[in-house]
């Protein structure tokens, strides 16, 4: 039943995707505007998960270049050298397309300065589960992806040294020592951003910094949400966040070397 419910949520996201695209076409037609390509996929567009009012919105400008880089990998294996060198499956175009699409979903939910995958909130960066990211895949591409296929793409990214994750285990206060888990910390590496090459383009770097400043003005924080917040008051949490804080600092230095940043107090 649990798996069936998850699959049903993904199917709903696929429907929302198609409804949102249809609504956007109707909106443009009513304004007399031409539309030649309303794909979401590797563009800076995003579909909001709103069944009652399906809608297409725009992500910040930097995502146009970043997600285009993901699409380029499909026909150009050397676009991401570490994947090309260390993951033999990348010789297959279908495998590259899988990785490119999963990358697009991860990156559209990533703070581009720290490399943290999640959602910035006033309490901090909220972790996202792989199931949530699979639903985002359905919203972005309008198609179903099997959890096993999504997991393969993640494995390839880790094998290339591009992506890291750390489980969050929570000991419950049930007297039996039961352990539950929360969505893992997920993090892109400095190597990934070096291969992505976003800092080579001043307009992209400037847009990334502008996005961070705008979010900070809105009161959003980009450090991981506190352990207590994740555990929601349970007694003990077993995790290793220090490693990911150092990775985030290292990733941030890539941007600092290119475009001076003021330290983020959040």
PLM regions with names:
Residues 1-19, 143, 147, 151, ...:
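Electrostatic interaction modules used in gene-expression and signaling proteins
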Residues 1-132, 241-265:
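Short recognition helix of helix-turn-helix/winged-helix DNA-binding domains
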Residues 106, 133, 137, 186-188:
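Short low-polarity hydrophobic stretches
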Residues 113-173:
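Winged helix-turn-helix DNA-binding recognition segment
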């Amino acid at each position: 039943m649990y798996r069936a419910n998850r699959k049903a949520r993904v199917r709903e996201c696929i429907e929302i995707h198609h409804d949102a695209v249809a609504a956007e076409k109707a909106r443009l037609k009513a304004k007399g505007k031409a539309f030649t390509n309303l794909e979401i996929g590797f563009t800076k567009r995003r579909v909001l998960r709103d069944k009652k009012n399906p809608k297409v919105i725009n992500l910040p400008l930097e995502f146009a270049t970043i997600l285009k880089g993901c699409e380029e990998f499909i026909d150009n294996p050397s676009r991401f050298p570490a994947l090309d060198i260390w993951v033999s499956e990348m010789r297959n175009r279908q495998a590259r397309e899988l990785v490119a699409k999963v990358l697009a979903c991860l990156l559209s939910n990533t703070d581009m300065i720290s490399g943290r995958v999640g959602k910035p909130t006033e309490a901090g960066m909220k972790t996202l589960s792989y199931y949530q990211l699979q639903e985002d895949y359905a919203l972005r591409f309008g198609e179903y992806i099997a959890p096993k296929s999504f997991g393969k793409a993640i494995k390839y990214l880790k094998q290339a040294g591009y992506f890291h994750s750390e489980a969050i285990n929570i000991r419950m206060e049930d007297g039996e020592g039961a352990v539950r888990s929360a969505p893992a910390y997920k993090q892109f590496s400095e190597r990934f951003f070096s291969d992505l090459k976003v800092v080579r383009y001043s307009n992209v770097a400037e847009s990334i910094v502008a996005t961070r400043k705008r979010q900070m003005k809105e009161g959003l924080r980009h450090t991981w949400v506190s352990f207590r917040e994740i555990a929601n008051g349970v007694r003990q949490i077993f995790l290793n966040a220090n490693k990911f804080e150092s990775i985030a600092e290292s990733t941030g230095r890539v941007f600092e070397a290119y475009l001076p940043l003021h330290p983020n107090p959040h």
